[in-house]
Regions:
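Proline-aspartate-enriched helix->loop->beta-strand connector
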Residues: 132, 136-146
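Active-site rim/loop-helix segments in enzyme catalytic domains that contact anionic ligands
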Residues: 1-134, 156-172, 179-183, 231, ...
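Short catalytic/ligand-binding loop motif for oxyanion handling, primarily in non-cytosolic enzymes
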Residues: 43-45, 75-84, 148-152, 186-190, ...
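A conserved mid-domain beta-alpha-beta active-site/ligand-binding segment of alpha/beta enzyme cores
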Residues: 189-254
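Membrane-proximal basic amphipathic "stem/tether" segments
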Residues: 424-463
Length: 463
């Protein structure tokens, strides 16, 4: 059963987007919850201390036990810290070159070693890895590949860390790992909270966009939907924890960068469900020896579903670095030797959005062989009749622009462990609110937004 949870986000207030609907559930279930904020949210340097105390106030609203700041910068001058060489010192937008805490506490590394860490990629990754291993939480919820560079940085570094942790032969740590977006379907979701019919999380698509690219590296149909706490759906906004948490972010009332108000996003964020993708730590390919007839096979079992070719700001869905067979390779073949005999029941293949995996032949060492025609999808799932094997061979007979980012192999009964988590599976049903009450709540909400915007303009030196 889940007794502890670790929630990893880039900036103060991202915990609201990523898990704001679930803190009540965690608290009421007695789950000890730690939130890790990787940056100080100091893009505007004079707001750093204020954002620290806003985060502490949000902690009290959400009633979770521990808040940790890693103390890194909110964006960087020149090369982003993710793209820098391992030990190259980066400078943050606020002019810092080492970790610090903007409030009355110490950042994570200083609390452990009495030393600040220079802003290097290696230190950033090391601090994330250290906090994961120190807490050994039963449940981890981490930010995913949003369009923001800091969000991508944390997601990618986390995946690097988890791949290394899980692949360590002496390690038996197998948490429930969930990845989720702060933007898609949440911060940038539809403005629908005050509608009379409650609607689940939806992703808005602009002209020319498709769901595969917006959800990269996942399939939208594979999402795990958690039912959010009941209080997050109340129209009595003074009792709604998501609205209260957003209201606590006074530095974000009227952004001098975008002109937006954080409260504007409440009707988008306060969904009845929280959507995540399950990164199953029992993927047997992680512990296997993987070889390929050509190309770099290490990408196939490193836990990474995306690796930028050049920069963290790359178009990852079409230009992520993965396994690509050589042009001269007439019959690209992948061979997976498992660490032990397993009963193989499912294979999941993750590709770039512009990669097309056509036909492949699957062979197991017991003589089982089948040909599979892959659907036109960047995530391909292959169900097998639970066959014992020590080796899997996949010969690809047709493809186009092929780049495979990861292969997962599972034994039977390795779906999402609903019986272990404190959450309830979200089941969509028609719930109709009182139309007049919804209208009055929205009217009051809009008046509140106008008021806080005016307050911010009066207080901020940027106007």
């Amino acid at each position: 059963m889940i007794e502890s949870a670790l929630i990893i986000v880039p900036h103060p207030d991202d915990e609201i987007n990523l898990a704001g609907g679930l803190f009540d559930v965690l608290h009421e279930s007695g789950v000890r919850t730690t939130v890790v904020m990787c940056t100080n949210g100091d893009f505007i340097s004079e707001n750093a201390a204020k954002r620290f105390y806003e985060a502490k106030k949000t902690q009290r609203i959400f009633k979770y036990e521990e808040l940790i700041f890693l103390g890194y910068g909110d964006d960087y001058v020149g090369t982003h810290i993710y793209d820098a060489n391992s030990n190259e010192i980066a400078e943050s937008h606020a002019g810092h070159r080492e970790t610090y805490c903007a409030g009355n506490e110490k950042e994570y590394c200083f609390g452990k070693t009495r030393k600040h860490h220079p802003y290097t990629r290696e230190n950033y990754k090391s601090d994330i890895r250290d906090v994961i291993l120190e807490k050994e939480a039963d449940l981890i919820i981490c930010i995913d590949l949003d369009s923001h560079k800091d969000h991508r940085c944390i997601s990618l570094l986390f995946d690097e860390c988890m791949g290394e942790i899980l692949k360590t032969s002496s390690n038996n740590y197998r948490p429930v790992i969930l990845k989720g977006f702060a933007y898609n379907g949440v911060w940038l979701g539809p403005y629908d909270f005050f509608e009379t019919q409650i609607k689940p999380t939806r992703i808005l698509l602009k002209s020319g966009e498709n769901l595969s690219e917006k959800c990269f590296p996942y399939d939208w149909n594979h999402r795990i939907q958690m039912k959010n706490g009941e209080k997050t759906q109340t129209l009595k906004l003074w009792k709604n924890p998501v609205c209260k948490a957003l209201y606590a972010q006074k530095t974000q009332y009227c952004s001098p960068i975008t002109g937006g108000c954080i409260l504007d996003h409440f009707p988008r964020i306060a969904n009845p469900d929280s959507c995540y993708w399950y990164r199953n730590a029992y993927n047997q390919a992680l512990f296997a020896q993987v070889e390929a007839s050509s190309g770099d096979a290490h990408y196939l079992n490193d836990f990474m579903l995306a690796v930028p070719e050049d920069s963290v700001s790359d178009d990852l869905c079409n230009h992520s670095r993965g396994w690509t067979p050589d042009v001269e390779d007439g019959q690209p073949t992948i061979s997976i030797l498992f660490a032990r005999e397993i009963t193989l029941s499912k294979i999941v293949i993750f590709q770039n959005c512009n990669s097309t995996l056509g036909t492949l032949t699957i062979r197991l060492d017991n003589g089982f062989e089948t040909e599979f025609q892959c659907p036109d999808n960047n995530v391909v799932t292959i169900q097998l009749p639970s066959v014992p094997t020590e080796r899997l061979t996949m010969q690809i007979t047709s493809y186009s622009n092929l780049t495979i980012n990861e292969i997962e192999c599972f034994e039977p009964d390795n779906g999402f462990p609903w019986d272990e988590v404190p959450f309830t599976k979200y089941e969509h049903r028609i719930v109709t609110r009182n139309k007049l009450f919804a209208f009055l709540a929205e009217y009051g909400f809009k008046a509140l937004v106008r008021m806080v915007r005016q307050y911010s303009k009066m207080k901020s030196p940027h106007y």
